[in-house]
Regions:
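Glycine/serine-rich loop-strand microenvironments at binding/catalytic pocket rims
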Residues: 4, 11-12, 18
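Conserved beta-strand-loop-alpha-helix junction that forms the acyl-donor binding cleft
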Residues: 12-15, 37-39
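Vicinal oxygen chelate
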Residues: 1-7, 29-81, 90-116, 126-131
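Conserved active-site tyrosine of GNAT-family acetyltransferases
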Residues: 18-23, 93, 120
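Helix N-cap motif at beta-to-alpha junctions
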Residues: 14-15, 84-87
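Short linear motifs centered on Gly/Pro in flexible linkers and helix caps
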Residues: 85, 117-120
């Protein structure tokens, strides 16, 4: 059986500000932005452009969901953005005003730093050690 995770839902306050952040600051590609009139919502998918999962940007449909914007994993790192050049991407992100909450560090598995997205979700920027 061959399976893969295709989409990860990320609850956002506003579609357009989230699209702007992910496409302009992280260089993600906007894969789809389709209005669904029967549900009065948009189907918005962004991707880092390589193989793997994409993000489905979803606005909350009830107050319980809204409460988790920026804290979908209870303060733990939520997503891991792999790169082939840590310092290139780190410096680019810093120049665009992205907040790093843990500075770059060499670990046995690679170089890593933790940044916050526009809502406060924590991400690892990581370049894995070549084996």
């Amino acid at each position: 059986m061959k399976q893969a995770i295709g989409l990860i839902a990320l609850v956002v306050k506003d579609y357009d500000e989230a699209i702007d952040f992910y496409t302009k600051k992280l260089h993600f590609k906007l894969i789809e932005d389709t209005y669904q009139p029967e549900q009065d919502k948009r189907w918005v998918v962004v991707s880092p452009g390589s193989t793997g999962a994409s993000l489905l940007l979803a606005k909350p449909s009830k107050p319980e969901q809204e409460a988790f914007i920026g804290n979908q994993t209870g303060g733990r790192v939520f997503l891991f953005l792999n790169t082939d050049d840590f310092w290139r991407d780190y410096n680019d992100m810093v120049s665009k005003g992205i907040t790093f909450v843990r500075e770059p560090k060499k670990e046995p598995y690679g170089t890593v730093a933790v940044f916050a997205d526009l809502y406060g979700n924590l991400w690892d920027l990581i370049e894995s050690r070549q084996t």
